[in-house]
Every structure is written in structure tokens, then in C-alpha cells.
């Protein structure tokens, strides 16, 4: 079956209008942004909303990348191509968004897909969730009772499940800029260019006085959600960076991930790759934090 079930459609005029519509429809509506995940699921009858609320008219309200005090804020309707082209993101968080966006699907998806849509789709193998988790990002969720701010490591409940209720929507993603010298990187193993990850790792660190003042490490496609490697992060904070330290962090990643065997590979393989990519991403982030320039990573395809 490649035809969606009958569905009602309306265009939103504001965020408040979206919330009102969601409430009036008793949470049975779905929000339509880029549509590259939702529409295929509707065609396969894996998603059968009774009503679609199109938020594309809200780009002027929800599409932005801006700096506010010690935070970077990204509107939920900001498209992947705009994240890739953002000079502000390249200045504050150089490389990590670029490396993730270049391997996210293809230009058609990047031109239409949005950061909010990617997060709410909650695919465990999705690239941006790892980036946002490594940067210790937070999602702003708005509903009839007001706004709440959710840490990214608490945002996803399982595959295709989030904390966002049927009468709520994501409006923004926020990041603290962090102290000292910063470096970050995104590593990915995929079957072919633009595919979902077999395994991916995102790392970000901040150096002060030669030691790690803050660090984020996340792995995707090795569990029911993107996994923040909290134990590895805590082990690294306050220590001087080194290849040996990052090798230990990679070992912890292999222990703390929860991969399953599927068409992309056996669990033991994914576990080993998570450790290798974690170490590699941390070393590249450290190199960049020292001010050295590295080219955008050429991601590895097993069949090559």
C-alpha cells in the first residue's frame, strides 16, 4: 500500500494556533514540517493521523540560528541546509554540524527537512540527535500549559518515541556555548552515502588550562535511542587529554552501548565500532580544540 489513508489538512498561522488545533483535535493530529519522514510512513500506513497541521507558514517564527547571551538557539523549523550554511554555528561549534549534515540523506532531504522534525522522528540511527546530545543541547517543548525545557538525553523515550505529548510541539533547540577552547567532530559508518548510520559517534570538548573543562560524547544506532556516554564523560572531565584517555573513553562506549543485530550488522560488530568511532571523534575534537585544522571527515562505507 503506497497511498495514505484519508486525512484532514490545515495550515497553521502561529505557534499558539498549532497548540489550539492540537488541543481541539484531542492530540490526534500530526505536525507536518519537511514531511520526509512522516509522509512515507503515511503511505505505508505506519502512521495514520486523522489531521495534518502544516507549520511551513511559520518559518518566519520558527526558522533561525541566533546567539542569545551564553546560548545558541535554533528554531525548530530551521532546515538542514540552513544549519549547514550557518556562519554562527561554524564559529561557535565548528565542524560538528557540518560533518553531520553532509552525510545526512541527500540534498532533497536537506533542503526540506528540519531540525525539529529530525528530533521528533526519534530514529535511533539519525545523525543530528547525536550531535545535539554531545553538545548537551536542550529542546523547548510548548503546549497548552506553557513551555518546558528538556535535556536531549531525556528527550527520546525509545524508537520513534519522545516526551512530546499529543498537544505539544518542539519550538526550539538550545545549547550553552561552553568555556575555553572548543573542538568537535562527528564520525559515521554507513552502508552507502546518505544512509542511516550503522554506528555514529559525536564528540565535543572544551579545554581550559590544558585540561578538559567539559566534554560531550554520544553514540547513535547502538541502542533504542541515541546514547549519551555519561560514564565516559565523567571519567574525562578535569584530566589532560591524550590518546590513552580517549582510548579508555572508547572502551567505556563499547561497554555502555546497547546494540542489536539487524540488517546493518551484528551486535558485536556495532559495539566494537562504537568504541573505535568514539575514540576517533574525541581525538579529532581535541585536535581542533588545539587550533589545528582538519578536513571534513570522509565517512567509511563497509563495501568500499
Task: Please state what every model-predicted region is.
Residues 1-304:
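C-terminal structural segment of proteins
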Amino acid at each position: 500500500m503506497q497511498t495514505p489513508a484519508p486525512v484532514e489538512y490545515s495550515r497553521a498561522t502561529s505557534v499558539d494556533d498549532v497548540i489550539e488545533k492540537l488541543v481541539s483535535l484531542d492530540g490526534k493530529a500530526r505536525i507536518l514540517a519537511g514531511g520526509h519522514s512522516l509522509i512515507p510512513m503515511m503511505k505505508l500506513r505506519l502512521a495514520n493521523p486523522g489531521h495534518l497541521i502544516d507549520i511551513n507558514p511559520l518559518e518566519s517564527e520558527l526558522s533561525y540560528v541566533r546567539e542569545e547571551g551564553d546560548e545558541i538557539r535554533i528554531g525548530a523549523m530551521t532546515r538542514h541546509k540552513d544549519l549547514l550554511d550557518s556562519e554562527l554555528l561554524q564559529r561557535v561549534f565548528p565542524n560538528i554540524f557540518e560533518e553531520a549534515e553532509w552525510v545526512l540523506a541527500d540534498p532533497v532531504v536537506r533542503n526540506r527537512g528540519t531540525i525539529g522534525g529530525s528530533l521528533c522522528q526519534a530514529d535511533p540511527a539519525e545523525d543530528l540527535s547525536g550531535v545535539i546530545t554531545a553538545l548537551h543541547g536542550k529542546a523547548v517543548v510548548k503546549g497548552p500549559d506553557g513551555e518546558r525545557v528538556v535535556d536531549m538525553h531525556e528527550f527520546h523515550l525509545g524508537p520513534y518515541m519522545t516526551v512530546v505529548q499529543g498537544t505539544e510541539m518542539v519550538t526550539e533547540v538550545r545549547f550553552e556555548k561552553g568555556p575555553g577552547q572548543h573542538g568537535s567532530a562527528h564520525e559515521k559508518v554507513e552502508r552507502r552515502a546518505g544512509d542511516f548510520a550503522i554506528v555514529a559517534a559525536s564528540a565535543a570538548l572544551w579545554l581550559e588550562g590544558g585540561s578538559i573543562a567539559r566534554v560531550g560524547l554520544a553514540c547513535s544506532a547502538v541502542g533504542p535511542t541515541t546514547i549519551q556516554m555519561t560514564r565516559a564523560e565523567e571519567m574525562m572531565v578535569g584530566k589532560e587529554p591524550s590518546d590513552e584517555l580517549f582510548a579508555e573513553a572508547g572502551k567505556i562506549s563499547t561497554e555502555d552501548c546497547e546494540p542489536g543485530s539487524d540488517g546493518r550488522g551484528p551486535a558485536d560488530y556495532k559495539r566494537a565500532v562504537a568504541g573505535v568511532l568514539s575514540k576517533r571523534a574525541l581525538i579529532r575534537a581535541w585536535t581542533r580544540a588545539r587550533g589545528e585544522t582538519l578536513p571534513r571527515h570522509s565517512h567509511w562505507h563497509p563495501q568500499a
